[in-house]
């Protein structure tokens, strides 16, 4: 038997899928990138334009980020949320922080016109639609927003 604490240490050392994206080991439909963060489309979006905003430093819990990275992450989220509303013409850019699927802190931006849009369960049974994701990424990546 492996003590739970030892398992947690070994498990946390594995690069997350987001770290693999950041390192260029896996592809993504990138919306934004700077020295501290990257933002890309969720391949199984709750709604079209569903963005994941991820710190480049792999930390499991958002509240464990250093203050500068935490603040920067939310500045990027604010900018991208405005961009989502402007480009997609939706009423809201809903935010969620869950962290159950990937052990790497991140914030999700989900375009919504009504509350039910936020709660839609995406179909993960098929292959992601790379053509639609690529077009959406181009639309969202090229619009500048002044904060």
Model-found features: residue ranges?
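Intrinsic disorder/low-complexity segments
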Residues: 1-8
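HIT superfamily nucleotide-processing domains
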Residues: 8-147
